[in-house]
């Protein structure tokens, strides 16, 4: 075969693989399934591909969804639900079985990126004591399966773990959560895994109307709103994220990266919830996360929008929980949004 042809083919293949791998700032989408009117998993994954959504977060494993993801080249964050924490923490064989069933059986065709062990586990939850042991057992199972270089194990927290968040440099964890956060941080540092953070400027804004400006929450403020020398903050997203980084730095986690595993703006059910505000927030977010925060400028922020669809069976209150979808159940977009 002509060596020049081989060289050209190699170059083309190299370009193909470079162009189909998501960058750090490529925004993914959360795929929740609490609805009785949603498209099938196969239709949904086809929608992801059509819209160039290259990463997905799943809150629990589902064989139909995982089968639909085979060969899609979409990177997957797979959730281990809170209800599994005790059994997985108490038995390495249970952890091994979970990884075999939901990861190994699909690993040849599905690009697993993270396993989120638990989601927003509260210190008051009866299963909180099992969180870190479950993370450790799942990590051992991943390593035993030979996937340690491919899949990072972490957990998802929300901003409620912070005692202070204003100004961002004052960010610190609540004293009562440290019994769980300290071992989480030690584990993540030892594994070079990121912390997954569910971050909603909407809830901060809606809970403090009159104190937090809407344009600050939507990335539309014309100039800096919060001064935190030597930094200035023009949007609430950066301020919240840097507050979490500040808390990590004070607790042995200065080396950790944060993945924003959920964010978005609802289109109904609450204060200033409408299609226009959701369009503004999500489109501005997609552009913004390529640039980093004042504390970590130039560092792309891996981020996941919540969510692909409205979910009419989400437990309420608050009623706003039902209205976070980017698309209607008929797969039509609520508003223009560009993932390219």
Curated annotation (Swiss-Prot):
What is catalyzed by this enzyme? Hydrolysis of (1->3)-beta-D-glucosidic linkages in (1->3)-beta-D-glucans
Where found in the cell? Secreted
Range of residues in the leader sequence? 1-25
PROSITE patterns per UniProt? GLYCOSYL_HYDROL_F17
State a single Gene Ontology molecular function: glucan endo-1,3-beta-D-glucosidase activity
Q: Which InterPro entries match?
A: Glyco_hydro_17, Glyco_hydro_17_plant, Glycoside_hydrolase_SF
The superkingdom of the source organism is Eukaryota
A GO cellular component term found in this entry reads:
extracellular region
Which PANTHER family does the entry mention? GLUCAN ENDO-1,3-BETA-GLUCOSIDASE BG1-RELATED-RELATED (PTHR32227)
Q: What does this protein do?
A: May play a role in plant defense against pathogens.
What is this protein's name? Probable glucan endo-1,3-beta-glucosidase BG1
Q: Which gene encodes it?
A: BG1
């Amino acid at each position: 075969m002509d060596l020049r042809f081989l060289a050209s083919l190699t170059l083309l293949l190299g370009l193909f693989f470079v162009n189909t791998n998501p960058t750090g700032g490529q925004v993914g989408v959360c795929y929740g399934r609490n609805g009785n009117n949603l498209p099938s998993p196969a239709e949904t994954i086809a929608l992801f591909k059509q819209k160039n959504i290259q990463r997905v977060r799943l809150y629990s494993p589902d064989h139909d969804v995982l089968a639909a993801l085979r060969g899609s080249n979409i990177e997957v964050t797979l959730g281990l639900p809170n209800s599994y924490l005790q059994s997985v923490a108490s038995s390495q064989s249970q952890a091994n079985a979970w990884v075999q069933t939901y990861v190994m059986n699909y690993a040849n065709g599905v690009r697993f990126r993270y396993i989120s062990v638990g989601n927003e586990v509260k210190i008051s939850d009866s299963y909180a004591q099992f969180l870190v042991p479950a993370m450790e057992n799942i990590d051992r199972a991943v390593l035993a399966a030979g996937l340690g270089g491919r899949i990072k194990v972490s957990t998802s927290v929300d901003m409620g773990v912070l005692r202070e968040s204003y100004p961002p440099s004052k960010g610190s964890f609540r004293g009562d959560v440290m019994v769980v956060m300290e071992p989480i941080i030690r584990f993540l540092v030892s594994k070079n895994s990121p912390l997954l953070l569910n971050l909603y400027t909407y809830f901060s804004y809606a809970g403090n109307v009159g104190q937090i400006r809407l344009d600050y929450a939507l990335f539309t403020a014309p100039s800096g709103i919060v001064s935190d020398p030597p930094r200035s903050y023009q949007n609430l997203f950066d301020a919240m994220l840097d507050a979490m980084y500040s808390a990590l730095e004070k607790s042995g986690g200065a080396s950790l990266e944060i993945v924003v595993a959920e964010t978005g703006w609802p289109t109904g059910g609450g204060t200033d919830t409408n299609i226009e505000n959701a369009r503004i927030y999500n489109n501005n977010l997609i552009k913004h996360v390529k640039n980093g925060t004042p504390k970590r400028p130039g560092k792309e922020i891996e981020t996941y929008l919540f969510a692909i669809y409205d979910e009419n069976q989400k437990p309420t209150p608050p009623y706003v929980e039902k209205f976070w979808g980017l698309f209607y159940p008929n797969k039509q977009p609520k508003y223009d949004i560009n993932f390219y």
